[in-house]
Each structure stands twice: as C-alpha cells, then as structure tokens.
Design a protein with these regions (language model features):
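Conserved ABC ATPase "signature" region
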Residues: 40, 85, 91-109, 137, ...
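ABC ATPase NBD coupling module
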Residues: 41-57, 83, 90, 205-209, ...
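Conserved ABC transporter NBD signature motif
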Residues: 32-40
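P-loop NTP-binding/switch modules centered on Walker-like glycine-rich loops
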Residues: 144, 148, 152-230
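Conserved signature/switch motifs of ABC ATPase nucleotide-binding domains
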Residues: 134, 141, 158
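Conserved ABC ATPase signature
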Residues: 113-118, 122
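Charged, flexible cofactor/metal-binding loops and thiol motifs
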Residues: 202-375, 382-385
Length: 389
C-alpha cells in the first residue's frame, strides 16, 4: 500500500529476491500478474517498462557488486537522471547528485570518488542515493543491510526510515532477519518455497502467528525479556528443491503440525515422528549399504533384519515403542524393504500407512483475522484439524 513498508521474510533460497526482481520486471513472470497502480506490467518490453523504471527502483544486497567500479559516484548517481531526462543539464544533475549524497549521510565532494574508496556502509548509501535519483514511488530493498556490520545496519535502517517519511516512499523490504522486520516494517509477508504462507501487520504477526512456519521462525528470534521467550521450534529435514516442490502443502515435509489422518490414534508428536520417517524414505535418505558396511565392521557379519533395525534407529525420531501399535508394523516393513533394495515398495508402504491431508491437498489462503491471511489447513475452517500445535 502507498507509504507503507511491507517486509518479505523467509529462508535463503525461498524466492524472496526473485520475487522482488520479478515485480520490477528484471525477471519475466512465468505465471500470475504484476500490477503497479492498476497497470499490468507482466510481459512489457524494456521500452514499455521505461516509464515505470522511474517510479520503481531497487536497492541491492551487495552494494559494491551493484556499483560500477569504473564510474565515479557522481556518474553512478547522475546516470539514472540522464536516462529519464531529469535535470536541465549535466551541471544541474551533478548538483542534484551532490544534494542526494549529503541527504544520505555522505559529502558532496564524494562525487569524484570511486566505489572501492568507500566502506560497505558508505557504498550502500551510494546505492540509496542512486535509487532516489529518479524520485521513485516504490523502492524494492533486497536485503540492504545483510552484508553490513551490525552497527552500520542500524544506521542504514534509520536512514531508510527517514527517507521514506520525507519522500512518501512505499518500501518492499526483503530480509531473512525478523528482528529487522520488527524495526522497519508495517506489514510482513512470510514466504516458503516460492509461496506466501502468511501476511499481516507486524505487531499482530509477532504476537500471534498463525502458520507453523511463521511460528518456527519467530521462535528463533532472541528476546531480552525472559517472559517473552519461548521454546525453540526445530524444523526437521532439509528444504526441498523449489524446482520440484512437494505436493499438497509445500511445508508438510518439515511441518511440526502436519495433520494426521483420521485413523491415527497417537499424539501429534508421534505422528510427526512417523511422518518424518515417511519423508526420509520417500526422499531416499536411508542408505542400507552404508549401514550394512558399518554393521559388518562392528559385528563381523549382519543380515537384512539387523540392517532394518539400524535404519529405523537412524531415520525415526524417538523410539518405535512410542508409536501406536498399528504404526510400528509398516515402519518395520518399509525398513526391511529398503534393506532388501526395494525402495519403491518401501515408499508405497509408508505412503499408505501415514497419509495426511497436508499431502493430499494444497491449502487455500484464508483470513483468520482482519488484515491477516494464512495458507494452512489448520487455520482453515473447512478442515476439522485439532489445533494442538
């Protein structure tokens, strides 16, 4: 929305930077729509995008890599003005550049210096000045402080806040640091594997997150107030490939609140453990040959049953005895199938034994509260999921 800061947060590789660059048409959108003040930007050529380039600018994550080392700072800041016919002549543009440098905390005399002559924080200030040179309405800031020292980060964040108020900017702030989000943003959008899973006002999201992924991210934020601290939610497993994401809910392979099937008689934690075993079998993470080699080194000889027992020990969080009796047999069967080299049969066994609506169906985006959205079966009234998590 006009004049607000929307933060986009998520783990590295989830698509935050690609999203920001796609909004500016630096990457072509493969699906969906990108609109700016009601105008459709998807599919526009570079020539057609030119009027929008002046209104939409970007601050990059690596300040030095985004600045031409062969150009002076004056040339870097005045180049966008020249492209968009801002300023009466070269002298006027240089004066504007000097004023911008002073506004971002540098000196007018710095126009004659080169980017390599500045510190990281100063280089980022040059990047901010360049983005402001064309008087944009929207700035996409792609992790603008992640490459800087903590003390310098605070200075750049404060500068962006001041400039936003002064120039009436809208800011899309991309970051993986939730402590930064709390400081600069009005609203936040949480991204996982290329999809927005939750949005809402920052204060409400921090106080009462809806999506399990958001809860896990917030549990990792250090808190000075002991009463505000909470138990860390550790996500098991690795992040799937965004090229081949899981079916259903993309978070189900790591979700601590994955929904059991109706026939499940154990606890949520027990199902999470059984489901983790299922995921590891499906992903081919069980290595019977390595286990067999180790057992032979330890015992001198081994058999498939012993290998299967060790596979269960390695791949199942907790103890097999903690699961309902009906769950132990398919786990033993799957482990024996893996030990015998029948990985496809093992995958079918665990898929049949431990189904979940989180796998069968992608969650729809619902509004659990005013100004809030979440894409999770647990907050969808159409799903009768026990909110134990």
């Amino acid at each position: 929305q006009e004049g607000e800061t929307l933060a986009v947060v998520g783990e590295s590789g989830c698509g935050k930077s690609t999203l920001g660059q796609t909004l500016l048409n630096l990457h072509g959108a493969t699906d969906g729509s990108v609109q700016f003040r009601g105008d459709e930007l998807t599919g526009l050529s570079d020539r057609e995008m030119r009027p929008y380039r002046r209104r939409m600018q970007m601050i990059f994550q690596d300040p030095l890599a985004s600045l031409n080392p062969r150009q002076t700072v004056g040339d870097i800041v005045t180049a966008p003005m020249e492209v968009h016919d801002i300023g009466e002549d070269a002298e006027d543009r240089l004066e504007r550049a000097e004023a911008l440098l002073e506004r971002v905390g540098l000196e007018a005399a710095h126009v004659d210096r080169y980017p390599t002559q500045f510190s990281g924080g100063q280089q980022q200030r040059v990047g901010v000045a360049r983005a402001l040179a064309v008087e944009p309405e929207l700035i996409v800031a792609d992790e603008p402080v992640s490459a800087l020292d903590v003390s310098v980060q605070a200075q750049i964040l404060e500068l962006l806040e001041e400039l936003q108020a002064e120039f009436g900017l809208s800011l899309l702030f991309i970051t993986h640091d939730l402590s930064v989000v709390h400081q600069v943003a009005d609203r936040v959008a949480v991204m996982y594997l290329g999809e927005i899973v939750e949005t809402g006002p920052v204060r409400e999201m921090f106080n009462d997150p809806e999506h399990p992924y958001t809860k896990s991210l917030l549990s990792a934020v250090p808190r000075i107030d002991p009463s505000a601290r909470q138990d860390r939610i550790i996500l098991e497993g690795t992040v799937p490939s965004p090229i081949d994401p899981p079916e259903g809910c993309r978070f189900h392979t790591r979700c601590p609140a994955v929904i059991p099937n109706d026939a499940w008689t154990g606890s949520q934690q027990a199902f999470r453990h059984a489901f983790t075993f299922r995921n590891r079998v499906e992903a081919g993470e069980l290595d019977p040959d390595a286990v067999r080699t180790r057992l032979e080194a330890e015992l001198g000889e081994t058999d498939d049953d012993t290998v299967a027992d060790r596979l269960i020990e390695n791949a199942l969080p907790g103890d097999l005895s903690d699961l309902p009796e009906a769950a132990t047999e398919p786990i033993r069967t799957a482990a024996q199938q893996v030990a015998a080299g029948d990985e496809d049969d093992a995958t079918g066994t665990v898929q049949e034994a431990f189904p979940s609506p989180c796998v069968a169906e992608a969650p729809r985006t619902v509004k659990p509260a005013p100004n809030r959205t979440a894409a999770c079966h647990r907050v969808d009234p159409e799903h009768d999921a026990d909110a134990e998590f």
